[in-house]
Amino acid sequence: MRRIIFARSLLLAVMLLALAVKSSAGVFLSVVIAPPALPVYEQPFCPGDGYIWTPGYWAYGDDGYFWVPGTWVLAPAPGLLWTPGYWGWGDGVFIFHEGYWGPYVGFYGGINYGFGYTGIGYRGGYWNNGAFF
């Protein structure tokens, strides 16, 4: 009898955990106010070989929009490129789409971030034999 109670309790715990994971999978940020225009700024010097520029973006917090400056970062693995995040319009709200690393630069809203990110693709460098130029 104890085994049956334990098995049922374990099954219930697994089901509740799965429900919690599933419910958090679709969390996103939406705002009814458009983000401000991108500021004009100078790109700092690249700190060394293999660094990729990740452009700044407008984030949204309790006090409204705030600017997150761009920075040079090392890719997490050779061959990966950064796709910037962007604010898109849909269903009457602005929705933020997170940036991500991948084997190619994906869609980032057609936003001209400059510094190689002109709205389509990336023209800021390339991978060759495991090194970024």
At which residue positions do the language-model features occur?
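Classical secretory targeting signals
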Residues: 1-26
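Low-complexity segments
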Residues: 26-133
